[in-house]
Amino acid sequence: MGCTHDCGSCSHDCSSEQDFSKKLNEMSKVKKVIGVVSGKGGVGKSLVTGLLAVSMQRLGYRTAILDADITGPSIPQAFGVREKIETLGEVMLPAVSRFGTQIMSINLLLPQESDPVVWRGPVIAGAVGQFWTDVYWKDVDFMFVDMPPGTGDVPLTVFQSLPVDGIIVVTTPQQLVGMIVEKAVKMAEMMNVPVLGLVENMSTYTCPDCGRQHAIFGESRLDSIAAAHHIPVLARLPIQPELAAQMDSGTIELFEGDFMQPAADRIAALLPC
């Protein structure tokens, strides 16, 4: 197919490619940007985003979350953030969680958090770009971008507009999900964005009575996907009702467990001492 010169919706490299990169405002400083993506919804991508931000914050890094899931935002709920966004001159001030994570989400701009966002793709992508350029991100070591599922307008906008240093791909054990995850991995490869690793959510369930592990959603294909693309497996999250309860109650910053440590170590390696 011939070139339409619409570079904003194209993932191919060519000599006539336009520069869609967006610059931060002069007040902001963000050292590293990590995208958290999934091929489909319902795999726990926002949970993983929250756990990554908290894990890095516990290591002493300054963290932020740009909630790019405009039509399905859940980050404010997970962190117990309710206050509306304020402005400082021409820039917006992100909300700050109990332990210091900066958060920008469309839910913090709506009159009611239950109000739907009924926008077309280009408008949604534009809003995500503004969350990068028009927010005062103060001295952030690691920003995590909670992407909407799939490979549509918003992931393309983020990959083209933001200086993404790498992505974490979230999946679950089901075979169909594994196939869709490969689409997300291949999109990142097409866009020359490094895939830092894979995280499998709902990997196994440990019976509280007998202590045996059960593969509730079937046998995992994670290792085969990782081997095919030469990507490390960074974490396997167990099914833990406590984690779901903490997401719902806004206390994700209080989670316990070391299952995210390999992922945190991989991300920390991006920032020289």
Language-model-derived ranges and their functions:
Residues 25-31:
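Phosphate-binding P-loop
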Residues 62-63, 68-113, 125:
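Phosphate-binding loop that captures ATP/GTP phosphates
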Residues 1-19, 185-273:
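C-terminal lobe/tail of nucleotide-utilizing enzymes
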Residues 155-176:
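Inter-motif core of Ras-like GTPase G domains
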Residues 32-70, 185, 191:
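Walker A/P-loop phosphate-binding motif and the immediately C-terminal alpha-helix
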